[in-house]
């Protein structure tokens, strides 16, 4: 898949088939995420991956209660922010966002679906990730991605809005 096509057609999937996600696919996703740009080349991230059914079911309760996507997902990836690894202080959220976008685009390219679940600054979700995935206190759970083969088809739609573009000055 070409990069522009991947960007324009990526969608957030919340329903997944009962189909495996392989270790090789997960490794490729992590490699893509870790190749994201970061301020000062700090790469201030750690990743927690689970394919354990009990943990995925627990995430459905502890992180996103009432949402069935974790019960259908075959895997989940949590990106954690490590402030001690920031190349330049204060840019860790941007760095982790770049890694998250790479992960989502790589998943799309491989025919997998995911959705970005915001964790940072949402205390109940942060606590849920710490509880289920054993995240240490010095790490900051940033974003969580249920992962699987999509069980729905979502049409690509243009999101370009020329009224939000300002040339030379506002």
What is the role of each PLM region?
Residues 1-170:
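Acidic, surface-exposed loops and disordered segments
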